[in-house]
């Protein structure tokens, strides 16, 4: 498991729904328990974006 997959697992455990979408203008968005991560990024970029969005949730 890479770091992104570990964060995804943590997010799901916390009741979050994470989807990859074609976002414009940002790498990630959060609204309630839903997180959108921009499609097409590298795994390290997705990891960084997901970590940032999870930080906004806690």
Short names for language-model regions:
Residues 1-58:
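Active-site hotspot residues in diverse enzymes, especially metal/ion-binding acidic/histidine motifs
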